[in-house]
Amino acid sequence: MKKPYRKISDYAIVGGLSALVMVSIVGCKSNADDKPKEQSSLSQSVQKGAFVILEEQKDKSYKVVEEYPSSRTHIVVRDLQGNERVLSNEEIQKLIKEEEAKIDNGTSKLVQPNNGGSNEGSGFGLGSAILGSAAGAILGSYIGNKLFNNPNYQQNAQRTYKSPQAYQRSQNSFSKSAPSASSMGTASKGQSGFFGSSRPTSSPAISSGTRGFNA
């Protein structure tokens, strides 16, 4: 019986609640090892969900610091003091709806020009950070067409990540899980973010919680 390659030590860079969530993900994958069909296609986890850590910045904006494919969608928010909590399904849907309204009226920072290229004073709120991440491509797939062909979104999506290294780790993680670039559209997107026509049209299961922990 094959064992999952991702060990808990792989996630040493994520702390507190995010590490506990990863333990549950690894446990679920261990049980799934007895099902060859499920184990044979890691792309299923990409389609089902993503584990995302959003970190609050000094200007009260948020950045993606880590994200991985997972069987369920988990969005962990880490504040300036290092406290973490998992957003509930209701919170996530509310944030996405609010951001969709901003996209429609052109006030979302995801669709605005990046003047000067400076992050100072132009950070992303929770809603835009979620939609700029892989989780947003899944949870907000029904509004993907409003963003995918927008050149400003294509430039801004990468800016939702804390660093180029964080963005590249995410790209590598999801492209390794995809069976091919043509079927999942992950490896070929480059700086275009994660939205694509191959994404599912309904939201996957979301694991949520509200307790705060210290990182």
Swiss-Prot record:
Compositional bias segments (type: Polar residues): 158-169, 184-195
Start-end of Low complexity biased regions: 170-183, 197-208
Topology with respect to the bilayer: Lipid-anchor
Any one annotated GO CC term: plasma membrane
Keyword NADP included in the entry's annotation: no
Signal peptide stretch: 1-27
InterPro entries tied to this protein: UPF0323 (IPR020913)
Region annotation (Disordered) ranges: 158-215
Localization: Cell membrane
Lipid-binding residues (covalent, N-palmitoyl cysteine): 28
Lipid-attached positions, S-diacylglycerol cysteine: 28
Record carries keyword Nucleotide-binding: no
Record key words, sorted: Cell membrane, Lipoprotein, Membrane, Palmitate, Signal
Family note: Belongs to the UPF0323 family.
NCBIfam families listed in its UniProt record: PRK04081.1
Protein name: UPF0323 lipoprotein jhp_0217
Lineage of producing organism: Bacteria, Pseudomonadati, Campylobacterota, Epsilonproteobacteria, Campylobacterales
